[in-house]
A protein has these predicted regions:
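The feature encodes a structural signal of leucine-rich repeats
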Residues: 55-57, 79-81, 103-105, 124-129, ...
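LRR N-terminal entry segment and analogous cap-like coil->beta motifs
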Residues: 37-78, 82
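Consensus "Asn ladder" position of solenoid repeat domains
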Residues: 49, 73, 94-97, 118-121, ...
Length: 297
């Protein structure tokens, strides 16, 4: 209880913690939850509050925490080193704040983490390779920050069959070829500065469902790329992709597709769902033609 009261004091006794009365059982307080058997605090989830303060370092003294969230609470400063003491943590949600500094490399020490959400902050620097040390990680959300450099090569070690990677709206420049060994379920690296070829991320034996690489500087020939049948959403708009759309796209049950604003040529393959999309899916290419675009000459 003393740790919780220290946290409350560090947060300037916000109204959302009005139930935190030391005369009552802390397991009945809002924001926290306790294990039914041990009565130890295992959950701290604070949302939708305009606190405008750093994350209290005392949070690291809640050593049995499994879930920790300061979500949309306007937290400031850097992510505190104290979080590295939370060895039981499996869920970390610090999205929608004003956190600064780097993505901490010490997060790679928290081996039970399955989810890291740091989206919508002001984090800078490169993505730490230490995150690949997390054997259970299934979701990594670092979108809407100011991250730079390459996606770490060590991300090829992620083995979770349902891996979700959100890195959009940053300033990343490279996806290493070794990531072709990783089987992403969902990858979004849109609105970065990534160039070159990313076709190695696809393949008929992959299980990728959603892939968004829009608004980058990708340059590769798409003609012979094999897309997996699991693919339902593909967005490649606003790049420098060349070649013809592969016939294999007709065998995929796509829900959404966007290849506009590239340098594609040739006839749009006929069949599957490719003619069910409107012309905006394909427009502003070099010489792409055929339904739903004008007939090829």
């Amino acid at each position: 209880m003393s740790t919780l009261l220290e946290i409350k004091n560090a947060l300037n006794n916000p109204y959302v913690l009005i139930s935190w009365d030391p005369k009552t059982d802390c397991c009945d307080w809002l924001v926290v939850s306790c294990d039914d058997k041990t009565n130890r605090i295992t959950r701290f989830v604070l949302t939708q509050s305009n606190l405008n303060l750093p994350i209290p370092t005392a949070i690291g003294d809640l050593k049995y925490l499994e879930d920790l969230a300061f979500h949309h609470t306007n937290m400031t400063g850097q992510i505190p080193q104290a979080i590295s003491k939370l060895s039981q943590l499996n869920f970390l949600d610090l999205r929608w704040n004003r956190l600064t500094g780097p993505v901490p490399s010490f997060l790679g020490q928290l081996k039970k983490l399955t989810y890291i959400g740091l989206s919508f902050n002001n984090l800078t620097g490169s993505i730490p390779s230490s995150l690949s040390n997390l054997p259970k990680l299934g979701g990594l959300l670092l979108d809407r920050n100011q991250l730079t450099g390459s996606i770490p090569e060590t991300f090829a070690y992620f083995v979770d069959k349902d891996f979700y990677l959100y890195l959009s709206h940053n300033q990343l420049t490279e996806i290493p070829k070794r990531l072709g060994h990783t089987n992403f379920t969902w990858i979004d690296v849109s609105r970065n500065r990534i160039g070159g070829d990313i076709s190695f991320l696809f393949g008929k034996n992959k299980s990728i469902g959603t892939a968004d690489f829009s608004r980058n500087m990708l340059e590769f020939d798409i003609s012979n790329v094999e897309f997996p049948k699991s693919l339902t959403n593909l967005d490649l708009n606003h790049n420098r992709i060349t070649g013809r759309l592969p016939e294999g796209l007709t065998k995929i049950e796509l829900v959404s597709l966007n290849v506009s604003y590239n340098r594609l040529c040739g006839q749009i393959p006929t069949g599957g769902r490719l003619q069910k999309f409107d012309y905006t899916t394909y427009f502003h290419n070099r010489c792409l033609c055929g339904a739903p675009l004008p007939t090829c000459k």
